[in-house]
């Protein structure tokens, strides 16, 4: 029930009805957020102009006023249809004008009435009313008396729960003997919505009105009881906390008397010991002690205490001064590297050089290497071998798909669940501040609205800055200069230049077939035999079988698919032995079909014959070197150049440069000039779903274009790579070693390369150079002379104006299905 001054409540009930003569037409005062019941005395604050005029009009005459409630209290100037029809005829008892211009009016409800009509009065509301009289109930029946008693008891219960029940209120309630008066009294003091209070007010029958009030009183009893329970629970909780605190303080006092430490004191002492043993730098130690002091002043159950504890745990567990001792025996390190990996001499020499310098200069900073090469050549496993050779711990962090800078630098401690970045986590895992830290797939880092992780790596991978690497979580510098960082990538194109500049790039090219056979015999076969539960004597795979697997069952620069095929052989043999069949099993080249099925790859040049408009280029992709086929055909049109196969801008420009060269030298190349005006030229690079770009397909495009225009076929055993200019000059390219391996896998015997790439032939393995013939050129004319075969039959030039129903141009030979490749090199 709403709070009501006891004097007002008693005055309300003691007021006599006095048979006052209430006029039929009264000024009306719209009231907000309250329903004024009969016999109710209530102060009203009046501030609206119309309302003030209505009060003035009532005071000027007989003080009678009609009070009606607005349907929406937020409406400042309500219309007649926004005011309830039923209201109270009231009399003004007192008026007080306030300094702010408002008027405080004390009114008493006299009788219920309803609006008959509004009289015309623009400056205020004036209404004609009809008084509503309740019927005389006479003697009350038992049911009504029981209802009244129930309502009174409920009211006393509510006031009792709230601590507001007084003898005066009890006396007032006991003195009411009319159900209508009781209903009005209780309803006026309940926290009811305007619609609920108005519904009770408009109920004329006193018993029905009391029944409605009884329902709301019952609801209020439940709410008051629930509120009392909540308050009691809160008080109990507070009492328990106070009791716990008191007992805890007593326990501390007892422990101090006995010379023993409590749990919190013990925790603080443990952290102090850990901070001392961690041998932190000065700045980190000061931060740790400051946080420990905060923890000491906190209540053990404080919400921030776990966050501070977690931070201190990280500070004391990070290896500030813990380091493994390097194995500086260069001979032993070389043996370990040779034991784990075949070839890769450049990388092994670089590691041994570092160990030699480290032996002479123990304070040398760790190198930052970047291994670049196709998948499966051993970049990741090489990192493990380097760690083993140096006697260091190894940690691998995969950067592929990371888009959040916080993965590198960590989250600030203000965030819930914050942790240090992956670099600090890795060092804690290794328990050493000088591990071999491999960051895999650095070329596949992403970036989004959360930041750019590659930019966060700039500090970590810069030897001039990483001695004071700042992790957002630790918020104190950490020295990374002793860490040997190794990154891996398939290509350097997507690595930001600023990051690439901080790393020493070492290219790991693909393996030759002979190298694959040797690696398979020394490493892959023994490993798969062991993993599949076999003994070395159970299975023997011949060298020819391994060579056939490398050339006809796989086509890759690395070794992953070859190892999978070897694993397939071992599993099939394991099954036979498990079924009780006796071995040993000899796997030869001729028996591979029985175990692995038909060959999956065939040398592509074995399936083709020289064709017009088809030239073979060489591409350098993430997966190594590949053959790249370029198809050109002519069709009647208006001399347009059509390019398809998802060619990038550089390749499109190469095609236009090739066309410009052909048009400029049409006489020398014996090209009919009418072809450029009456025929469209379509250049297509198969595997259209894969984007391709790069300048090194220039001479291949020129060769295919000239072949189609002169109808001279292109030799099918020649591949070519080189950039072309509109003057016909052939410019150098990159990735010669990888492209040579790709040509060899494709069955190509001859490669045309730019003259300026001749010096790079020394990097191509000797066994590859023996199987390939290299032709160096400096001009496109030399390329065409070597690649184009004589025309089979001289063709008559097409007419300028073909007839309306002209026959289609003579169909070229069926173009071969090109092997899927990605893009020409940069």
UniProtKB/Swiss-Prot annotation:
Residues 788-826 are annotated as: Disordered. It is found in: Cytoplasm. Signal peptide: none annotated. Residues 796-816 have a biased composition (Basic residues). Induction: By heat shock. ATP binds at residues 373-380. This is Lon protease. The lineage of its organism: Bacteria, Pseudomonadati, Thermodesulfobacteriota, Desulfobacteria, Desulfobacterales.
């Amino acid at each position: 029930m709403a709070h009501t001054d006891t004097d007002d409540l008693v005055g309300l009930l003691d007021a006599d009805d006095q048979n006052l003569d209430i006029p039929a037409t009264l000024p009306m005062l719209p009231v907000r957020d309250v329903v004024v019941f009969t016999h109710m005395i209530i102060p009203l604050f009046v501030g609206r102009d119309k309302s003030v005029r209505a009060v003035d009009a009532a005071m000027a005459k007989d003080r009678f006023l009609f009070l009606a409630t607005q349907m929406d209290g937020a409406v400042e100037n309500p219309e007649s249809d926004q005011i309830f029809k039923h209201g109270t005829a009231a009399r003004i008892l007192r008026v007080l004008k306030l300094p702010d211009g408002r008027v405080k009016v004390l009114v008493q409800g006299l009788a219920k009435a309803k609006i008959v009509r509004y009289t015309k009065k623009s400056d205020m509301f004036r209404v004609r009313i009809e008084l509503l009289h309740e019927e005389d109930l006479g003697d009350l029946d038992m049911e009504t008396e029981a209802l009244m008693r129930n309502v009174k008891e409920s009211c006393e219960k509510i006031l009792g729960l709230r601590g507001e029940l007084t003898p005066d209120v009890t006396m007032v309630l006991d003195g009411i003997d009319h159900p209508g008066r009781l209903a009005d009294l209780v309803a006026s003091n309940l926290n009811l919505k305007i619609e609920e209070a108005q519904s009770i007010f408009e109920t004329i029958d006193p018993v029905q009105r009391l029944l409605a009030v009884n329902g709301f009183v019952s609801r209020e009893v439940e709410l008051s009881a629930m509120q009392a329970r909540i308050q009691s629970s809160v008080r109990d909780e507070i009492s328990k906390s106070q009791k716990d605190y008191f007992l805890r303080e007593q326990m501390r006092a007892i422990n101090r008397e006995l010379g023993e430490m409590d749990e919190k004191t013990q925790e603080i002492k443990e952290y102090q010991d850990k901070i001392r043993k961690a041998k932190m730098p000065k700045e980190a130690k000061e931060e740790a002690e400051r946080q420990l002091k905060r923890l000491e002043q906190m209540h053990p159950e404080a919400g921030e205490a776990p966050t501070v504890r977690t931070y201190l745990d990280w500070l004391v567990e990070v290896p500030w001064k813990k380091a493994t001792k390097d194995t500086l025996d260069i001979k032993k390190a070389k043996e370990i590297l040779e034991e784990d990996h075949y070839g890769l001499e450049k990388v092994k020499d670089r590691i041994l050089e570092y160990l030699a310098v480290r032996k002479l200069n123990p304070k040398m900073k760790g190198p930052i290497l970047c291994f670049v090469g196709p998948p499966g050549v051993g970049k990741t496993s090489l990192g493990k071998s380097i760690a083993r050779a140096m006697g260091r711990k190894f940690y691998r962090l995969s950067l592929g798909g990371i888009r959040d800078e916080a993965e590198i630098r960590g989250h600030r401690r203000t965030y819930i669940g914050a942790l240090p970045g992956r670099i600090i986590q890795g060092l804690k895992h290794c328990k050493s501040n000088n591990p071999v830290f491999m960051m895999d797939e650095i070329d596949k880092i992403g970036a989004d609205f959360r930041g750019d992780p590659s930019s966060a790596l700039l500090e970590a991978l810069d030897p001039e800055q990483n001695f004071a690497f700042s992790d957002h979580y630790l918020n104190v510098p950490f020295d990374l200069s002793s860490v040997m960082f190794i990154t891996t990538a398939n290509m350097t194109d997507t690595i930001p230049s600023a990051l690439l500049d901080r790393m020493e790039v070492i290219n790991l090219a693909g393996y030759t077939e002979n190298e694959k056979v040797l690696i398979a015999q020394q490493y892959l076969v023994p490993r798969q035999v062991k993993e599949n539960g076999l003994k070395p004597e159970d299975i023997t795979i011949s060298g020819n079988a391994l060579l056939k697997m490398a050339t006809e069952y796989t086509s890759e620069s690395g070794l992953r698919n070859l190892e999978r095929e070897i694993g397939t052989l071992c599993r099939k043999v394991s099954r036979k032995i498990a079924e009780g069949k006796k071995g040993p099993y000899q796997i030869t080249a001729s028996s591979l079909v029985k175990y692995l099925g038909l060959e999956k790859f065939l040398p592509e040049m074995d399936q083709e014959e020289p064709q017009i408009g088809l030239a073979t280029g060489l591409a350098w992709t993430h997966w190594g070197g590949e053959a790249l086929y370029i198809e050109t055909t002519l069709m009647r049109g208006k001399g347009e150049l059509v390019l398809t196969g998802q060619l990038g801008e550089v390749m499109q420009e190469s095609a236009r440069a090739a066309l410009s060269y052909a048009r400029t030298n049409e006489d020398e190349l014996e090209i009919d000039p009418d072809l450029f005006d009456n025929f469209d030229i379509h250049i297509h690079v198969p595997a259209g779903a894969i984007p391709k770009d790069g300048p090194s397909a220039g001479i291949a495009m020129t060769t295919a274009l000239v072949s189609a225009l002169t109808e001279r076929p292109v030799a099918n055993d020649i591949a070519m790579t080189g950039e072309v200019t509109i003057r016909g000059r052939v410019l150098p390219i990159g990735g010669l070693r990888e492209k040579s391996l790709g040509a060899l896998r494709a069955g190509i015997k001859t490669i045309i390369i730019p003259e300026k790439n001749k010096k790079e032939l020394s990097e191509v393995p000797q066994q590859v150079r023996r199987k390939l013939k290299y032709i160096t050129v400096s001009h496109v004319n030399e390329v065409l002379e070597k690649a184009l075969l004589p025309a089979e039959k001289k063709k008559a030039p097409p007419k300028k104006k073909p007839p309306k129903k002209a026959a289609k141009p003579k169909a070229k030979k069926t173009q071969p299905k090109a092997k899927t490749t990605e893009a020409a090199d940069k």
